[in-house]
Amino acid sequence: MQLNVTHRTNAERLEKHNRELETALAKKTEEHKEQAKALLLLQDDMLANQIQLNVLEQKTEALQQENETLVQRLVAKAAADADKMNDANAFLER
């Protein structure tokens, strides 16, 4: 009789431990799912930021090229104006 009670007690203890392990596993599984969701959100954000960065870099490059073109045009106009002024001064000096 004592042996039967001991087996029952051991079985109950093992069943309780098994339930605790199942609960812990379920909790860890849920945590893993939440972390996976968070990781996906971070990856999506990172991708969106990378796309924005690429767009901004392209705009920056275009603006730098436009600026260079405008500076060249301004320098050319200033040189043309200076040439005209020099020609006018030369004409007046005759």
UniProtKB/Swiss-Prot annotation:
<protein>
    <recommendedName>
        <fullName>Autophagy protein 16</fullName>
    </recommendedName>
</protein>
<keyword id="KW-0072">Autophagy</keyword>
<dbReference type="GO" id="GO:0034045">
    <property type="term" value="C:phagophore assembly site membrane"/>
</dbReference>
<keyword id="KW-0472">Membrane</keyword>
<keyword id="KW-0653">Protein transport</keyword>
<dbReference type="Pfam" id="PF08614">
    <property type="entry name" value="ATG16"/>
</dbReference>
<dbReference type="InterPro" id="IPR013923">
    <property type="entry name" value="Autophagy-rel_prot_16_dom"/>
</dbReference>
<comment type="similarity">
    <text>Belongs to the ATG16 family.</text>
</comment>
<keyword id="KW-0813">Transport</keyword>
<comment type="subunit">
    <text>Homodimer. Part of the ATG5-ATG12/ATG16 complex. Several units of each may be present in this complex.</text>
</comment>
<feature type="coiled-coil region">
    <location>
        <begin position="2"/>
        <end position="77"/>
    </location>
</feature>
<dbReference type="GO" id="GO:0015031">
    <property type="term" value="P:protein transport"/>
</dbReference>
<comment type="function">
    <text>Stabilizes the ATG5-ATG12 conjugate which is necessary for autophagy. The ATG5-ATG12/ATG16 complex is required for efficient promotion of ATG8-conjugation to phosphatidylethanolamine and ATG8 localization to the pre-autophagosomal structure (PAS). Also recruits ATG3 to the PAS. Involved in endoplasmic reticulum-specific autophagic process and is essential for the survival of cells subjected to severe ER stress.</text>
</comment>
<keyword id="KW-0175">Coiled coil</keyword>
<dbReference type="GO" id="GO:0006914">
    <property type="term" value="P:autophagy"/>
</dbReference>
